[in-house]
Structures are given as C-alpha cells and as structure tokens.
Curated annotation (Swiss-Prot):
Protein name, entry field: Conotoxin ArMSGL-013
Residue list for modification Tryptophan amide: 38
Annotated tissue distribution: Expressed by the venom duct.
One annotated GO molecular function: toxin activity
Subcellular location: Secreted
Lineage of the species this protein comes from: Eukaryota, Metazoa, Spiralia, Lophotrochozoa, Mollusca
Residues passing through the membrane, by range: none
UniProt note: domains: The presence of a 'disulfide through disulfide knot' structurally defines this protein as a knottin. The cysteine framework is VI/VII (C-C-CC-C-C).
Propeptide: 1-5
C-alpha cells in the first residue's frame, strides 16, 4: 500500500480499502474515498 503525503486516519483507510479505493482524507468528518486523490 502506498503511503499518502498527508496523514489520513486508519479507520478511513480501512473503510476505503473495503471498496478498493484510497482514502483521500475526511470531508465533513466522513471518510472520503476515491480511486484517484487530486492535489
């Protein structure tokens, strides 16, 4: 798993991994998952 430059919560990474996506961070306190994180 490649590490992101910014630190993301492990819960976010784990919930996104279930969808086979990457955690891009939190949006309104909710995990924001995407295949590609922009910027």
């Amino acid at each position: 798993r490649r590490s992101l430059t910014r630190r993301v919560p492990e819960e976010c990474e784990e919930s996104c991994e279930e969808e086979e996506k990457t955690c891009c961070g939190l949006e309104n306190g909710q995990p924001f998952c995407s295949r590609i994180c922009w910027g």
